[in-house]
Amino acid sequence: MSTYLKFAGLGALACLVASCETPGTQATRQAATAHGRRITNVRTTAYTHTERGGRRNAVGKNLSGQGHVSAAADWSRFPLGTKFQIVGTQDRYIIDDYGGALVGTNTIDLYKTSRGAMRLWGVRRVDIDILEWGSKQMSLKVLAPRRKNGLVRRMIAGIEANKS
């Protein structure tokens, strides 16, 4: 009987502790992985080349749907060249693009090769493993000539504020 009470008490304590975690801390929870860092509860959306931006990414190359697939993000949060994998899948991506709606968010926009695949993805929250962090210096080099754009200026300010 006393063993049962101990387990019941531990279970109740675990539930209490878990319920104290707020959605904000869940969204930014990070853990070390073999490759770098796991980031949990990342909001992802999808885009494709038939949308306004066309087939080229921010560095002027074709969007990639193979190997490390193209992805867009706020470069002050995920610098140009950041490679990551969606946990539990073989899906690997590289940040080689950005989008105005992503600036100031932790959202990553995943490239899909068709509108159907883009719609099928929709909006999902996923855990990602950072395989390799991109370069803040390269991000700044690409963004500097585009400084007239207000959203680009916000990314540049974010990168410069987080240089470490």
Locate each region found by the language model:
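Solvent-exposed, well-ordered loop and adjacent helix/strand elements within mature globular domains
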Residues: 20-164
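Bacterial N-terminal signal peptides that target proteins for export
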Residues: 1-8
